[in-house]
Amino acid sequence: MSAAAVVWLSMLGALVVNIQPMFLGAISEVYGFDAAQLGFISGAELGGGCIASLLALYWFPRLNLSKLISVALVVSVVGNLVTPMATTYTSLLIVRFCTALFGTGVLYAIILGVIGQMQNREKLFASAIILQVVSVAVFMLLTPELISEGSMTGVTRLMAALMASGFYAKNYLVIVSHRASDHAASKSLGLLLWGLPGLALLGLVAFDVGISSIWAFVERLGAEAGLSMDDSGLALAAGSGIGVLGAFFAAYLGMRWGRLKPFTASILGLLIACLMFMEASTWFSYMLAVGLLNLFWNFALPYLLGSIALFDKTGRLMVLIPAAQSAGFAIGPMVAGLFIVGADYRVSALVAFVAFVCCAAIVLPMLLKMKNSPVGQK
């Protein structure tokens, strides 16, 4: 039951990141914000999660994690209920930032730290991704109907209800006690900042810059291809359904092929997806591009996260994963939003292409070195 609780809570912690396309699309439809404003709203929330994760380096080995989960869930519920009341750009920016900083960001950091202490981490990551993809598909289908009356209330109430379900899952969560002295914790922090651990996290940042550059604006890319929001939602749901196969395949394959081959194949697939987004002009071509993006995103991620987990079995390194992911997901929409001219959202796919090339340049040599000289494996 503890594994199931971890998987469910990880879905809640990553929910806003995963449903960004329809969440930002809903904000655009309801409030009429432009691409740059949407990028900074996304960046503010993800930046809050990044800060929460960085602060977790201090409190993860020191504080009562069970109580912190409860506080984070309360903030997440309240933040989503308050969101429809924030009707201006600035107020919405502040509400979403605080919700991430004290709510979902804290929750996600704790859960990934807990996964770092458990066995079969690649399979846990893959299972968590499968559930996250299911949540994406649900929101893709429901969001157009939930905002049909010109309000964000339906979307945020659903998000709040899901966050509240975390209190039930928390009852089955087993957290290993790992209190550490200030000296030991500081020493661990110093070790994290140098060598392969830092390189792996930098690669994760570049990977998520690429993903988020497209993902934040993928609904808008559908609109540019001539699709209505309903049609885009159906294509995104279908594409997400294709994408879940990547996580299933990663869970089935495990370490049979190591990490280098699956990750290399994933980067090549993601580059092809970027090119397809640039040329998408029909529902089918758009859906196929979304499917490839999700397929190789979900296939690559368990191996990338698993390589990071090799370096630390206490969970302290793992709490930095949300910071790296949040940084990437915050930077991606901001950079893409600044380069988008008018309604030409295809620029976001070009930004993603460059980011994936940078990710490959960082991660592939690291994985090759780990293959030749296994690090942290037992």
Segments the model singles out, each with a brief description of its role:
Residues 20-21, 196-237:
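Extracytoplasmic gate region of multi-pass secondary transporters
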Residues 51-87:
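Conserved MFS/SLC helix-loop-helix module at the cytosolic interface between two early adjacent transmembrane helices
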Residues 52-65, 246-259, 340:
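Helix-to-loop junctions at the C-terminal end of transmembrane segments
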Residues 91-106, 205, 285-299:
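Hydrophobic core of transmembrane alpha-helices in multi-pass small-molecule transporters
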Residues 97-131:
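Cytoplasmic helix-loop-helix junction between adjacent transmembrane helices
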Residues 142-147, 155, 159-182, 362-367:
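C-terminal membrane-cytosol helix-exit motif in multi-pass small-molecule transporters
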Residues 257-304:
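C-terminal transmembrane helical hairpin of 12-TM major facilitator-type secondary transporters
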Residues 311-345, 352:
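A late C-terminal transmembrane helix in Major Facilitator Superfamily
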